[in-house]
Protein backbone atom coordinates (compact mmCIF):
# COMPACT_ATOMS: atom_id res chain seq x y z
CA UNK A 1 0.00 0.00 0.00
CA UNK A 2 1.26 3.47 -0.91
CA UNK A 3 2.59 5.55 1.97
CA UNK A 4 2.19 9.32 1.92
CA UNK A 5 5.65 10.66 2.67
CA UNK A 6 4.39 14.23 3.03
CA UNK A 7 1.88 13.90 5.84
CA UNK A 8 1.54 17.64 6.43
CA UNK A 9 0.06 18.48 3.03
CA UNK A 10 -3.09 17.73 1.10
CA UNK A 11 -6.42 16.84 2.63
CA UNK A 12 -8.36 13.93 4.08
CA UNK A 13 -11.61 12.39 2.88
CA UNK A 14 -14.19 11.83 5.62
CA UNK A 15 -16.27 8.80 4.66
CA UNK A 16 -19.21 10.03 6.72
CA UNK A 17 -21.80 8.64 9.09
CA UNK A 18 -23.36 6.01 6.84
CA UNK A 19 -22.32 3.85 3.91
CA UNK A 20 -25.73 4.51 2.30
CA UNK A 21 -25.81 7.87 0.45
CA UNK A 22 -29.64 7.97 0.33
CA UNK A 23 -29.69 8.23 4.13
CA UNK A 24 -27.51 11.35 4.21
CA UNK A 25 -30.42 13.82 4.01
CA UNK A 26 -32.09 12.07 6.95
CA UNK A 27 -28.89 12.19 8.99
CA UNK A 28 -28.47 15.84 8.03
CA UNK A 29 -31.93 16.77 9.32
CA UNK A 30 -31.59 14.76 12.55
CA UNK A 31 -28.08 16.00 13.35
CA UNK A 32 -28.99 19.62 12.54
CA UNK A 33 -32.02 19.43 14.86
CA UNK A 34 -29.86 17.87 17.59
CA UNK A 35 -27.23 20.57 17.18
CA UNK A 36 -29.80 23.37 17.45
CA UNK A 37 -31.25 21.78 20.60
CA UNK A 38 -27.72 21.52 22.00
CA UNK A 39 -27.12 25.21 21.38
CA UNK A 40 -30.43 26.28 22.93
CA UNK A 41 -30.20 23.98 25.96
CA UNK A 42 -26.61 24.70 26.90
CA UNK A 43 -26.81 28.44 26.23
CA UNK A 44 -29.90 28.57 28.47
CA UNK A 45 -28.02 26.95 31.35
CA UNK A 46 -25.04 29.28 30.89
CA UNK A 47 -27.25 32.39 30.82
CA UNK A 48 -29.31 31.32 33.83
CA UNK A 49 -26.18 30.50 35.82
CA UNK A 50 -24.79 33.96 35.07
CA UNK A 51 -27.95 36.09 35.36
CA UNK A 52 -29.79 34.53 38.31
CA UNK A 53 -28.18 35.27 41.68
CA UNK A 54 -29.79 32.19 43.24
CA UNK A 55 -27.74 30.00 40.92
CA UNK A 56 -24.42 31.55 41.90
CA UNK A 57 -23.36 28.36 43.68
CA UNK A 58 -20.50 25.89 43.07
CA UNK A 59 -22.88 23.32 41.57
CA UNK A 60 -24.10 25.71 38.85
CA UNK A 61 -20.61 27.09 38.32
CA UNK A 62 -19.47 23.60 37.30
CA UNK A 63 -22.70 22.97 35.38
CA UNK A 64 -22.13 26.13 33.33
CA UNK A 65 -18.58 24.89 32.67
CA UNK A 66 -20.03 21.60 31.45
CA UNK A 67 -22.48 23.44 29.19
CA UNK A 68 -19.69 25.61 27.75
CA UNK A 69 -17.67 22.46 27.20
CA UNK A 70 -20.53 20.67 25.45
CA UNK A 71 -21.11 23.68 23.18
CA UNK A 72 -17.48 23.72 22.10
CA UNK A 73 -17.28 19.91 21.96
CA UNK A 74 -20.18 19.50 19.56
CA UNK A 75 -19.22 22.59 17.51
CA UNK A 76 -15.77 21.10 16.89
CA UNK A 77 -17.30 18.31 14.80
CA UNK A 78 -20.95 18.91 13.84
CA UNK A 79 -20.56 21.83 11.35
CA UNK A 80 -18.02 19.84 9.32
CA UNK A 81 -20.29 16.81 9.53
CA UNK A 82 -23.28 18.80 8.24
CA UNK A 83 -21.17 20.21 5.39
CA UNK A 84 -20.15 16.73 4.30
CA UNK A 85 -23.70 15.40 4.54
CA UNK A 86 -25.19 18.28 2.56
CA UNK A 87 -22.99 18.21 -0.54
CA UNK A 88 -20.72 15.94 -2.56
CA UNK A 89 -17.51 17.39 -1.10
CA UNK A 90 -16.36 15.08 1.71
CA UNK A 91 -12.87 16.49 2.15
CA UNK A 92 -11.29 18.25 5.12
CA UNK A 93 -7.95 20.04 4.89
CA UNK A 94 -4.93 18.74 6.76
CA UNK A 95 -5.02 21.80 9.01
CA UNK A 96 -8.73 21.33 9.63
CA UNK A 97 -8.22 17.67 10.50
CA UNK A 98 -5.36 18.47 12.89
CA UNK A 99 -7.41 21.21 14.57
CA UNK A 100 -10.39 18.91 14.93
CA UNK A 101 -8.20 16.18 16.40
CA UNK A 102 -6.59 18.49 18.97
CA UNK A 103 -9.84 20.22 19.99
CA UNK A 104 -11.91 17.03 20.19
CA UNK A 105 -9.31 15.29 22.37
CA UNK A 106 -8.89 18.38 24.55
CA UNK A 107 -12.58 18.87 25.24
CA UNK A 108 -13.35 15.17 25.60
CA UNK A 109 -10.67 14.67 28.27
CA UNK A 110 -11.70 17.91 29.99
CA UNK A 111 -15.22 16.56 30.36
CA UNK A 112 -13.82 13.33 31.84
CA UNK A 113 -12.09 15.33 34.58
CA UNK A 114 -14.94 17.81 35.06
CA UNK A 115 -17.45 15.04 35.77
CA UNK A 116 -15.17 13.84 38.60
CA UNK A 117 -15.03 17.40 39.96
CA UNK A 118 -18.83 17.58 39.85
CA UNK A 119 -19.04 14.30 41.76
CA UNK A 120 -16.72 15.78 44.41
CA UNK A 121 -18.98 18.83 44.61
CA UNK A 122 -22.01 16.58 45.19
CA UNK A 123 -20.08 14.60 47.80
CA UNK A 124 -19.28 17.73 49.81
CA UNK A 125 -22.83 19.07 49.41
CA UNK A 126 -24.47 15.87 50.67
CA UNK A 127 -21.90 14.51 53.12
CA UNK A 128 -20.60 17.82 54.52
CA UNK A 129 -23.57 20.19 54.09
CA UNK A 130 -22.65 22.52 56.96
CA UNK A 131 -19.17 23.10 55.52
CA UNK A 132 -20.19 23.11 51.85
CA UNK A 133 -19.70 26.81 51.06
CA UNK A 134 -16.52 26.92 53.13
CA UNK A 135 -14.94 23.94 51.36
CA UNK A 136 -16.23 24.79 47.88
CA UNK A 137 -15.02 28.37 47.99
CA UNK A 138 -14.54 30.39 44.77
CA UNK A 139 -10.78 29.88 44.78
CA UNK A 140 -11.12 26.08 44.93
CA UNK A 141 -13.87 26.08 42.29
CA UNK A 142 -11.79 28.09 39.84
CA UNK A 143 -8.77 25.92 40.61
CA UNK A 144 -10.67 22.68 39.94
CA UNK A 145 -12.09 24.10 36.71
CA UNK A 146 -8.59 25.12 35.59
CA UNK A 147 -7.23 21.66 36.39
CA UNK A 148 -9.99 20.13 34.26
CA UNK A 149 -9.29 22.30 31.23
CA UNK A 150 -5.50 22.09 31.49
CA UNK A 151 -5.59 18.34 32.12
CA UNK A 152 -7.65 17.88 28.98
CA UNK A 153 -5.17 20.00 27.04
CA UNK A 154 -2.31 17.80 28.23
CA UNK A 155 -4.14 14.71 26.99
CA UNK A 156 -4.70 16.36 23.61
CA UNK A 157 -1.04 17.23 23.17
CA UNK A 158 0.11 13.69 24.05
CA UNK A 159 -2.36 11.73 21.91
CA UNK A 160 -2.39 14.12 18.94
CA UNK A 161 1.41 14.22 18.77
CA UNK A 162 1.69 10.42 18.71
CA UNK A 163 -1.11 10.11 16.15
CA UNK A 164 0.19 12.75 13.73
CA UNK A 165 3.64 11.14 13.65
CA UNK A 166 2.18 8.08 11.92
CA UNK A 167 2.84 7.54 8.18
CA UNK A 168 -0.59 7.81 6.56
CA UNK A 169 -1.66 5.80 3.53
CA UNK A 170 -1.87 7.59 0.20
CA UNK A 171 -5.66 7.45 -0.15
CA UNK A 172 -6.22 9.37 3.13
CA UNK A 173 -9.78 8.08 3.49
CA UNK A 174 -10.84 8.44 7.12
CA UNK A 175 -13.59 5.88 7.71
CA UNK A 176 -15.49 8.17 10.06
CA UNK A 177 -17.27 11.53 10.07
CA UNK A 178 -14.47 13.30 11.97
CA UNK A 179 -10.72 13.09 12.51
CA UNK A 180 -10.56 10.92 15.62
CA UNK A 181 -7.66 8.91 17.01
CA UNK A 182 -9.03 5.36 16.40
CA UNK A 183 -9.96 6.25 12.81
CA UNK A 184 -6.58 7.92 12.19
CA UNK A 185 -4.74 4.87 13.56
CA UNK A 186 -6.62 2.68 11.08
CA UNK A 187 -5.46 4.99 8.30
CA UNK A 188 -1.78 4.45 9.14
CA UNK A 189 0.42 2.17 7.06
CA UNK A 190 3.16 1.54 9.62
CA UNK A 191 3.34 -0.20 12.97
CA UNK A 192 0.67 1.25 15.29
CA UNK A 193 1.31 -0.90 18.37
CA UNK A 194 2.89 2.00 20.30
CA UNK A 195 0.01 4.31 19.37
CA UNK A 196 -2.54 1.74 20.49
CA UNK A 197 -0.67 1.26 23.77
CA UNK A 198 -0.60 5.03 24.39
CA UNK A 199 -4.29 5.27 23.43
CA UNK A 200 -5.26 2.50 25.84
CA UNK A 201 -3.10 3.85 28.66
CA UNK A 202 -4.26 7.45 28.39
CA UNK A 203 -7.91 6.50 27.90
CA UNK A 204 -7.81 4.17 30.91
CA UNK A 205 -6.48 7.07 32.97
CA UNK A 206 -9.19 9.44 31.69
CA UNK A 207 -12.15 7.02 31.77
CA UNK A 208 -11.80 3.93 33.96
CA UNK A 209 -10.03 5.75 36.81
CA UNK A 210 -12.56 8.63 36.95
CA UNK A 211 -15.53 6.25 36.81
CA UNK A 212 -14.07 4.26 39.71
CA UNK A 213 -13.57 7.43 41.77
CA UNK A 214 -17.11 8.62 40.98
CA UNK A 215 -18.68 5.28 41.95
CA UNK A 216 -16.80 5.22 45.26
CA UNK A 217 -17.88 8.78 46.04
CA UNK A 218 -21.49 7.91 45.29
CA UNK A 219 -21.37 5.01 47.71
CA UNK A 220 -20.66 7.56 50.45
CA UNK A 221 -23.29 9.91 49.02
CA UNK A 222 -25.93 7.15 49.05
CA UNK A 223 -25.21 6.44 52.71
CA UNK A 224 -25.54 10.14 53.55
CA UNK A 225 -28.79 10.52 51.56
CA UNK A 226 -30.41 7.67 53.48
CA UNK A 227 -29.69 9.53 56.73
CA UNK A 228 -31.49 12.71 55.63
CA UNK A 229 -34.70 12.93 57.67
CA UNK A 230 -36.52 15.44 55.48
CA UNK A 231 -38.39 13.76 52.62
CA UNK A 232 -38.02 16.87 50.46
CA UNK A 233 -34.30 17.11 51.24
CA UNK A 234 -33.78 13.45 50.43
CA UNK A 235 -35.69 13.81 47.15
CA UNK A 236 -33.71 16.89 46.11
CA UNK A 237 -30.36 15.21 46.84
CA UNK A 238 -31.48 12.02 45.09
CA UNK A 239 -32.66 13.83 41.93
CA UNK A 240 -29.45 15.86 41.66
CA UNK A 241 -27.22 12.81 42.12
CA UNK A 242 -29.22 10.63 39.73
CA UNK A 243 -28.98 13.32 37.04
CA UNK A 244 -25.20 13.40 37.40
CA UNK A 245 -24.92 9.61 37.36
CA UNK A 246 -26.97 9.36 34.15
CA UNK A 247 -24.63 11.85 32.46
CA UNK A 248 -21.62 9.93 33.80
CA UNK A 249 -22.77 6.58 32.41
CA UNK A 250 -23.80 8.04 29.04
CA UNK A 251 -20.50 9.84 28.47
CA UNK A 252 -18.00 7.41 29.99
CA UNK A 253 -19.81 4.35 28.63
CA UNK A 254 -19.64 5.56 25.04
CA UNK A 255 -16.08 6.89 25.44
CA UNK A 256 -14.81 3.60 26.89
CA UNK A 257 -16.46 1.61 24.10
CA UNK A 258 -15.16 3.94 21.39
CA UNK A 259 -11.58 4.34 22.62
CA UNK A 260 -10.59 1.36 24.74
CA UNK A 261 -11.51 -1.35 22.24
CA UNK A 262 -8.57 -2.39 20.04
CA UNK A 263 -8.35 0.22 17.30
CA UNK A 264 -7.82 -2.31 14.51
CA UNK A 265 -10.49 -4.83 15.49
CA UNK A 266 -13.56 -2.87 16.55
CA UNK A 267 -16.61 -2.91 14.29
CA UNK A 268 -16.48 0.31 12.25
CA UNK A 269 -20.27 0.77 11.95
CA UNK A 270 -20.62 0.48 15.71
CA UNK A 271 -17.64 2.79 16.15
CA UNK A 272 -19.32 5.47 14.04
CA UNK A 273 -22.53 5.15 16.04
CA UNK A 274 -20.65 5.47 19.34
CA UNK A 275 -18.72 8.51 18.05
CA UNK A 276 -22.02 10.05 16.97
CA UNK A 277 -23.44 9.33 20.40
CA UNK A 278 -20.84 11.15 22.49
CA UNK A 279 -20.25 13.96 19.97
CA UNK A 280 -23.92 14.76 19.21
CA UNK A 281 -26.36 12.99 21.52
CA UNK A 282 -24.68 13.44 24.92
CA UNK A 283 -24.17 17.24 24.59
CA UNK A 284 -27.83 17.52 23.57
CA UNK A 285 -29.33 15.49 26.43
CA UNK A 286 -27.10 16.84 29.23
CA UNK A 287 -29.15 20.06 29.68
CA UNK A 288 -32.38 18.05 29.64
CA UNK A 289 -31.12 15.57 32.23
CA UNK A 290 -29.98 18.32 34.59
CA UNK A 291 -33.06 20.54 34.25
CA UNK A 292 -36.15 18.34 33.75
CA UNK A 293 -36.61 17.74 37.49
CA UNK A 294 -34.63 20.72 38.75
CA UNK A 295 -36.91 23.24 40.43
CA UNK A 296 -34.11 25.79 40.84
CA UNK A 297 -33.41 25.96 37.11
CA UNK A 298 -37.12 26.02 36.26
CA UNK A 299 -37.63 28.81 38.78
CA UNK A 300 -34.71 30.80 37.36
CA UNK A 301 -36.08 30.38 33.83
CA UNK A 302 -39.53 31.50 34.99
CA UNK A 303 -38.08 34.59 36.67
CA UNK A 304 -36.02 35.45 33.59
CA UNK A 305 -39.02 35.08 31.27
CA UNK A 306 -41.17 37.03 33.71
CA UNK A 307 -38.70 39.93 33.65
CA UNK A 308 -38.73 39.83 29.87
CA UNK A 309 -42.53 40.04 29.72
CA UNK A 310 -42.53 42.78 32.35
CA UNK A 311 -40.03 44.85 30.40
CA UNK A 312 -42.10 44.54 27.23
Curated annotation (Swiss-Prot):
Residues 49-57, 121-139, 223-236, 293-312 are cytoplasmic. One of its GO terms (cellular component) is plasma membrane. One of its GO terms (biological process) is G protein-coupled receptor signaling pathway. Disulfide bonds join 97-189. Keywords: Cell membrane, Disulfide bond, G-protein coupled receptor, Glycoprotein, Membrane, Olfaction, Receptor, Sensory transduction, Transducer, Transmembrane, Transmembrane helix. Residues 1-24, 80-100, 161-200, 262-272 are extracellular. CDD domains: 7tmA_OR2B-like (cd15947). It is found in: Cell membrane. Glycans are attached at residue 6. It holds the Pfam family 7tm_4. The keyword Protein biosynthesis does not apply. It comes from the Eukaryota. Olfactory epithelium. Present in various subcellular compartments of the olfactory sensory neurons, particularly in the axonal processes and neve terminals. The keyword Cell membrane applies. The chain crosses the membrane at residues 25-48, 58-79, 101-120, 140-160, 201-222, 237-261, 273-292. GO terms for molecular function: G protein-coupled receptor activity; odorant binding; olfactory receptor activity. Gene3D superfamilies: Rhodopsin 7-helix transmembrane proteins. It is a multi-pass membrane protein. Belongs to the G-protein coupled receptor 1 family. Olfactory receptor that is activated by the binding of organosulfur odorants with thioether groups such as (methylthio)methanetiol (MTMT). Also binds odorants acetophenone and benzaldehyde. The activity of this receptor is mediated by G proteins which activate adenylyl cyclase. May be involved in the molecular processes underlying fasciculation and targeting of olfactory axons. This is Olfactory receptor 2C1. It comes from Mus musculus. The gene is Or2c1.
Amino acid sequence: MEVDSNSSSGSFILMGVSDHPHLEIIFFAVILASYLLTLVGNLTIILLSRLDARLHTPMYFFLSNLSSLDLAFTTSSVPQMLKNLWGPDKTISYGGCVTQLYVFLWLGATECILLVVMAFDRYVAVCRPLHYMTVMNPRLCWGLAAISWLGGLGNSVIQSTFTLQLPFCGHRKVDNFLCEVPAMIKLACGDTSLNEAVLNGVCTFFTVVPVSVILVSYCFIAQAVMKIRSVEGRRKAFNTCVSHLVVVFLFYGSAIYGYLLPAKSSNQSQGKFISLFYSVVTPMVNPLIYTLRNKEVKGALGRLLGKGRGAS
